[in-house]
Amino acid sequence: VRSRRWPVIAMIGLALAIGAGANAVEQNHLASGWHTVARGDEGGDLTVGNLQVHVHGAVASPVLDDDEPVTSPGSFVLVDLSYATTDSWFLPESPVLVDGDGREYTEPSGFGSAGGVWMAGPDIWYRGGLLFEVPTDVVDDLSIEFRPERTQALLPSTVLRVPLTVSLSAEPLVLGYPTVLAEGER
């Protein structure tokens, strides 16, 4: 009877060890996901992954001109930027605004493709605006965070965070579509 227990005990022990090992590997991959944050500044060419970015600035207003005025209980923020890729065409993951407390703000829905991300091409720079809606009290402490294309979502990656200089406007913000830039322009 004893000789039959040892193989069963050994198999249970092996199964527990394999399960614990798999959990440790999975937790390490997930825990290391977006940990590295590269910092950049407005006005310069920056690269993260295969995305090249140039942030020109941002403007905030409580009113958006979307064929008719749209008001916000907070503020609309329009980030002026240009970007391209280093290798191939793709649609970047939507950037987010991050406030001083680490809260993230994504683009609001309902405004069509104006004010949202656009296709990026290899060294083909487009300039446009990305629209966000944030509480008014965080406008002075915002950064924009870019997350490059991830081929392996579980592997560690780098994000680019650029602090924004946001000017305030009483005029409604106007959305437009991105335009292709001449060679060397940003």
Regions found by a protein language model. Give the residues of each.
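Conserved functional micro-motifs across diverse proteins
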Residues: 1-78, 82-186
